[in-house]
Amino acid sequence: MSKEIRYGKDAKQSLLKGVDLLANTVKITLGPKGRNVVLDKGYGSPLITNDGVSIAKEIELKDPYENMGAKLLYEVASKTNDVAGDGTTTATLLAQSIIHKGFKAVDNGANPVLVREGILRAGKEVSQKLLEKSRPVETSEDIENVASISASSREIGKIIAEAMDKVSKNGVISVDESKGFETELEVVEGMQYDKGYISPYFVSDRETMTVELENPHVLVTDQKISTIQDILPILEQVVKANKPLLIIADDIENEVTSTLILNKLRGTFNVVATKAPGFGDNQKDMLNDIAILTGATFYAKDLQMKLQEIKLEDLGLVQKAVVKKDTTTLIGGHGTKDAIDKRILEIEAQINSSTSDYDKKRLQERLAKLAGGVAIIKVGAATEAELKEKKLRIEDALNATKAAILEGIVAGGGSVLVDIQTELKETLKDSHIDIYKGILAVLDSLSEPLYQIAENAGFDGQDILTEQRKQNKNYGFDAKEGKWVNMLKEGIIDPTKVTRNAILNASSIGALMITSEAAVVEIKDKDQNIPTQPMY
């Protein structure tokens, strides 16, 4: 395959154009009065959303050089979404600004390697300042405020706060579709563990990369399944019962996985396999929890229990199992209330007698999963397009809330970044001018979110920015109401983790891009664009 290469200014301008096309599409969604973007998915109804990463994911540009720039910027949104679950638009906007300012410094003669050093240093300093300004989430009102700001809806904020009240901050909250028009909260006994399917070939929904099993049997063991013969007797019984099967085992050989996938694809039976969560004694405890919750017999290797002897009545049952890449959620276990209550008392006793903070934390997590259950937010809407959009907003709000619980909250609306900008411009300096130019590329970009929020709300961004620099601590611009308020008191807050990851990821990709001096792409043959005729 032939390649085309562009150097220097030509390469940079093409990459920048791609960066701008993506960022300019995403940034119109920022803030309480941000707009939506309509995405053609190629099937079904279009998706109307203001979720930065969902928009960035759909953008494919015709020019391969511009497309590279867009894809590099998408990495910022994607990484921020993976780690913090929200803040993708802010991250994209910050990255665009840092890249522009970094390239400008290099074009004016600065050494790109030294500018890169300054960008990375400033990114870390801003991140540290955010942690210093952070305050912990203490009340249900804080949770409601974080969720409301993320989803741009007080109603959604209240539902998420209520869900966290019912299953605790460490509980599991999932988002599902409702058959009605109203969005409701339902709490079901269940648990989630941090292991997903062992192969993507088990997936039934390719768009979300998940698999859902309705009323499946559950096999629980800490043994390794080495051959298909180990579980053949129970597989035959499951096929006769005509029920799906979830296998939770310490490990599963490739040969066994291949056989299970082949039979699933052929429609012989519906099965999903996951590895057991945890390790060592903690793994045994967690598997015992799952067995008690589902009503299964835990086939432990320490007790010399043979997998070939498993009977149908040894399997557990759940109303629903949702298996993703990294997590499995069990909803509506058929374990007896007495057995679950007894197990909860055992764990509570262990917490009281434990002297290790690490052990206490692990035990509390297990207790939350057993006692709290799963809260399901059932999203209702009048149309499919509204349902998809609402579901995305709720998922973002949920992620933002979890991030706030982990690292706390800061004043929102972009005000905290402008405050940090003012502080660091006084203290963060470097004797080498090129490194300092890199530092300034980051610091000067910190005002972009506030500027864009104001512009999207119909105000003059520069005027609002000038006024923000005169404000007292924690004061900022409420773009929804068009007035200056105490952001923390009014509940206009951002999760520290979200803002911190946005700046770290933006400075990381910005630092990489400004050191790029050439771009290489494949030259597509004209024949490649002609679709091949089907063979009959």
Curated annotation (Swiss-Prot):
Cross-referenced SUPFAM superfamilies: GroEL apical domain-like, GroEL equatorial domain-like, GroEL-intermediate domain like
Catalytic activity: ATP + H2O + a folded polypeptide = ADP + phosphate + an unfolded polypeptide
Taxonomic superkingdom: Bacteria
CC annotations in GO: cytoplasm
GO-annotated molecular function: ATP binding; ATP-dependent protein folding chaperone; isomerase activity; unfolded protein binding
Role summary: Together with its co-chaperonin GroES, plays an essential role in assisting protein folding. The GroEL-GroES system forms a nano-cage that allows encapsulation of the non-native substrate proteins and provides a physical environment optimized to promote and accelerate protein folding.
Similarity comment: family membership: Belongs to the chaperonin (HSP60) family.
Protein name, entry field: Chaperonin GroEL
Organism: Acholeplasma laidlawii (strain PG-8A)
Lineage, highest ranks first: Bacteria, Bacillati, Mycoplasmatota, Mollicutes, Acholeplasmatales
